Amino acid sequence: MGGLNQGGSEVLLMRQGTIQRATIGGYFQLRLSSPYSVPLFNPRDYLTKPHEYNQYIQDNIDLLCGDAMLELQSNAISTLANNQIPGTNTWVAIINWLNDFIQPIEKDYDMVFLDANPSFSMYTQIAIATSTKMVLPVMADDSSRRAIQNAFSLVYGLKLPSEIYSKYAFAEKLKEVDMPLPKVYMILKNRLTQYMGAASAYATVLQEIDKDVLSLLKTYTDMFAFKTLDMGIID
């Protein structure tokens, strides 16, 4: 869109100011008034052609812009997902919002990329439930190691602190309605580590991440789209 130095912020504000608010927040705003049934809408009203604002981006790429308004919508979305309505699985209806958006236009695209917040908010769950594959980026620090561990707990329900949580786990809810979980497709080590020596403490952390992933790969092979570490971990 142009980035910080090329007017990207102004372009985003302009897209947010359209009648339909051409962002993910604009689409979710539409769904807040029709959370459990798909309203009549045209997904393309919410899409942006980045090439029109940045000539270096290919013209075959469409973008559904991000929106800080998601944070304001988050509580409302969670409340709607937890409502108890006879004959309606409210959680599934909400979790399919992005599927509802993509379905009318999916034949026009070869691939859809979803950039999700690292938190496990309801809108992140919507993105994950829509995905078939996950790419997990990591930095060379302990917080990234914990983040990988948390991702497997939150998404796949592994190593939960108590069986009490299993009933409410994301993976269990998808399983109940026969919705598949995305597979871990790739783990990307941040390129900043290229300047760090192999003997550094940073390298040790990355090696520990490798060990954690290898252990999971051996035990839960069906959760991964790769069979060996060198196929799935990118330095």
Locate each region found by the language model:
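P-loop NTP-binding core
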Residues: M1-D235
